[in-house]
């Protein structure tokens, strides 16, 4: 279920829900909650670039899904009073795809590339000269008649977003002048986000209910907003339209989001490691096969929170559950084997 919560907007929402999702997104630095250090720095960098009349340095935003990388990119564009073009790494299959975007950028525009770690190597190399010198080389003809011409580009800012910064090549990473990692949110801050979103949705919500949704949202604003929208449905049908603590708990139980914010797949991963592999260590690909999920999805979507909260750990030999996982699942940990001298 939670993988749906973490998909991109185009994959996840109907046309009506897309409009609601966009309406919930903050449009300025002042509206954006959390990530205070990053915001403080970005305000300075954007303000200085505007004063000098220069494009903002290229920006790399990385961190787990749903923390606001796309939202921040749009905010940066708004604060620069510029237009933004949005694409993603897998879409840019050949240099011509990238060239079409770059040549249509106006001065100080923003080009946002989501999942930039998935750029193929040919397109990535083509991007280097565009980022450094605002120039690209285009090949004309082929074979013996092949020749290249250089085309100048308007100065622009590239914002790359990724959940897996470690997969970026060193040459690409080095070309970003601004590098920011977004971190998970605490429940108190997420409560503010839930309350703000409920106001925008014209849905009354009690503070206790907002906190209940927030603390089960895995530290992720996108999940908090999605749970809020679904809880609003329950309040409308099973209540009087106000989201109370009781309604929130009913909705979250129906959505299979447990007391600690873990969903079916989270618990399935932990249970599988305990029941089939004696708590680990076990390899990622083996876990993926056992739970019928893609290894990449487990690594990007599920593992970060399980590790962050202390249910799972990575070792040199594979993944292992922790005592907290046994406690959460109400299981008895295996007895520790004795040492040689006991």
UniProtKB/Swiss-Prot annotation:
> Keyword annotations for this protein?
ATP-binding, Cytoplasm, DNA damage, DNA recombination, DNA repair, DNA-binding, Hydrolase, Nucleotide-binding
GO CC annotations, alphabetized: cytoplasm; Holliday junction resolvase complex
The segments labelled Head domain (RuvB-H) in the record are: 259-342
- This entry's Enzyme Commission designation comes to 3.6.4.-
Annotated positions binding DNA: 314, 319
Binding-site residues, Mg(2+): 70
Q: Where in the cell is it found?
A: Cytoplasm
| Pfam families recorded | AAA_lid_4 (PF17864), RuvB_C (PF05491), RuvB_N (PF05496)
- What does the record give under GO molecular function? ATP binding; ATP hydrolysis activity; four-way junction DNA binding; four-way junction helicase activity
Q: Where does ATP bind?
A: 24-25, 66, 69-71, 132-134, 175, 185, 222
Give me the ranges of the annotated region Small ATPAse domain (RuvB-S).
Answer: 186-256
Query: InterPro entries this protein is in?
Result: AAA+_ATPase (IPR003593), AAA_lid_4 (IPR041445), DNA_helicase_Holl-junc_RuvB (IPR004605), P-loop_NTPase (IPR027417), RuvB-like_N (IPR008824), RuvB_C (IPR008823), WH-like_DNA-bd_sf (IPR036388), WH_DNA-bd_sf (IPR036390)
User: GO biological process: what's one of them?
Assistant: DNA recombination
- Region feature (Large ATPase domain (RuvB-L)): 1-185
Write out the catalysed reaction. ATP + H2O = ADP + phosphate + H(+)
Q: How does it assemble?
A: Homohexamer. Forms an RuvA(8)-RuvB(12)-Holliday junction (HJ) complex. HJ DNA is sandwiched between 2 RuvA tetramers; dsDNA enters through RuvA and exits via RuvB. An RuvB hexamer assembles on each DNA strand where it exits the tetramer. Each RuvB hexamer is contacted by two RuvA subunits (via domain III) on 2 adjacent RuvB subunits; this complex drives branch migration. In the full resolvosome a probable DNA-RuvA(4)-RuvB(12)-RuvC(2) complex forms which resolves the HJ.
Entry's free-text remark on domains = Has 3 domains, the large (RuvB-L) and small ATPase (RuvB-S) domains and the C-terminal head (RuvB-H) domain. The head domain binds DNA, while the ATPase domains jointly bind ATP, ADP or are empty depending on the state of the subunit in the translocation cycle. During a single DNA translocation step the structure of each domain remains the same, but their relative positions change.
The record's section on HAMAP family has: DNA_HJ_migration_RuvB
The family classification in the record reads:
Belongs to the RuvB family.
> What biological function has been recorded for the protein in this entry?
The RuvA-RuvB-RuvC complex processes Holliday junction (HJ) DNA during genetic recombination and DNA repair, while the RuvA-RuvB complex plays an important role in the rescue of blocked DNA replication forks via replication fork reversal (RFR). RuvA specifically binds to HJ cruciform DNA, conferring on it an open structure. The RuvB hexamer acts as an ATP-dependent pump, pulling dsDNA into and through the RuvAB complex. RuvB forms 2 homohexamers on either side of HJ DNA bound by 1 or 2 RuvA tetramers; 4 subunits per hexamer contact DNA at a time.
Please give the name of this protein: Holliday junction branch migration complex subunit RuvB
